[in-house]
Regions:
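Beta1/beta-strand and adjacent pyrophosphate-binding region of the FAD-binding site
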Residues: 1-12, 29
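Short hydrophobic core segments
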Residues: 5-7, 31, 223-236
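Short alpha-helical segment within the catalytic ATP-binding CA
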Residues: 15
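Glycine-rich FAD pyrophosphate-binding loop
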Residues: 18-47
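General small-molecule cofactor/ligand-binding pocket signal
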Residues: 29, 204-208, 339
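A conserved beta-strand/loop capping segment in the N-terminal third of enzymes
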Residues: 42-55, 61-113, 167-173
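Active-site/ligand-binding neighborhood in enzyme catalytic cores
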Residues: 87-227
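C-terminal segments that line or cap access tunnels to active or ligand-binding sites in enzymes
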Residues: 227, 236-371
Length: 372
């Protein structure tokens, strides 16, 4: 007998399951259609090289939320890794995010902060204008426009200005990618961290289990209304795409083993030029300099619109998407005994710490739902 079913073994679902099991004594069953836990944070050790690979793209944990940091440290220790990214433009490598070092290297100048700020422009109405207003046309065209066009397969003039809001621009020489108080990578890997979260006598995990497969007993049609559910899958799928499918971007990864101790000297190298088909190359060994390897693994990352069967990564959020989402949110709010959460369940981009923080906030409400 189970008190709560959690659909999705990503960080939102696992946080919800662990708290409900350990703090409220609920017996929780976690379902995931994949063959592993951890959601998109899942990592695996390459059998040929022993290098830890982030299967769904680079994941770096960072947060300034004390509550989240205290919580995650119950399940893993973190390295002192600090993320730094570089970008290649026309055969030259520049530090990212855009900072005084990037600006002065690009212009072959020695600008101070005030002079660099003066490169910007007027108030923006779309992503193209937002980028220019932040850093001026030359820098925007070099580092943002082509990269964004590859990411979204859309002219930046047709994208909302909000998409670029996550891109920091600094008028000093700080090239640390994140500014959060805490940052690092789980010492034993993301999968070990997630397994520790699920390691509780009140938690049962069932992998390779599709919540919508009526041939397995814990399917949507049989449990909704009978057992409380935390649902972290796509919200449109839960309602059988009643109002249409929501738009997502997906990623393709091409993995290659390289017979060299160091391919690019950095974990992540972006490629800003539209003439290069991929957006970046990951070299995962550099995430853990405390580990030693003789060879390497690189992964090229490509971005495109998601189609049926693809893994959804980033919500597109067009006007049509937002109209559909409003309808799905109304249906979700009226769905008794089901809590919708996480990146897919709420149709929003969430960093790892944000997903965990959201789950921690919502645990009491879910526990109350399960007690009815």
């Amino acid at each position: 007998m189970t008190d709560l079913i959690v659909v999705g073994a990503g960080l939102y679902g696992l946080t919800m399951a662990e708290r409900c099991a350990s703090q409220y004594g609920l017996k929780v069953t976690v379902l995931d259609r994949r063959s592993h836990i951890g959601g998109n944070a899942f990592s695996e050790f390459d059998p040929e090289t022993g290098i830890e690979i982030h299967k769904y793209g680079a994941h770096i944990f960072h947060t300034s939320n004390e509550r989240v940091w205290e919580y995650v440290n119950q399940f893993t220790q973190f390295t002192d890794y600090v993320h730094r990214v570089y970008t290649t433009h026309r055969g030259e490598v520049f530090p990212m995010p855009i900072n005084l070092g990037t600006i002065n290297q690009f212009f072959r100048a020695a600008m101070g902060p005030d002079a660099a700020r003066d490169l910007g422009g007027a108030s923006p109405s779309n992503l193209d204008e937002q980028g220019v207003s932040l850093i001026g046309r030359p820098l925007y065209d070099a580092f943002i426009r082509g990269y964004t066009a590859k990411q979204w397969q859309t002219d930046p003039k047709d994208l909302p200005a909000s998409i670029i809001s996550r891109l920091p621009v600094r008028f000093d020489y700080n090239n640390r990618y994140f500014n959060d108080t805490y940052e690092g990578l789980p010492k034993d890997g993301y999968t070990a961290w997630c397994e520790n979260m699920a390691n509780h006598p009140n938690i049962s995990v069932q992998l390779d289990t599709d919540f919508f497969d009526v041939s397995q007993p814990l399917n949507r049609d049989s449990v909704v209304g009978s057992v409380p559910v935390v649902y972290t899958g796509p919200v449109d799928r839960f309602f059988d795409f009643e109002f249409g499918e929501l738009g997502w971007r997906t990623l393709d990864f091409v993995r290659e083993t390289v017979d060299t101790a160091d391919f690019q000297g950095i974990p992540v190298m972006n490629y800003a030029d539209e003439s290069v088909p991929f957006t970046r190359i990951h070299e995962f060994k550099h995430f853990h300099p405390e580990r030693t390897y003789d060879s390497g693994v690189i992964v090229r990352e490509f971005s495109r619109f998601a189609q049926g069967g693809d893994e959804p990564y980033y919500p597109v959020g067009t006007v049509q998407d937002r109209e559909k989402l409003l309808q799905y949110r109304q249906r979700a709010a009226a769905q008794d005994g089901v809590h919708f959460g996480g990146r897919l369940g709420t149709y929003q981009y969430l960093d790892m710490h944000m997903a965990i923080a959201s789950a921690l906030t919502n645990v009491p409400g879910v526990a109350e739902m399960a007690a009815r």
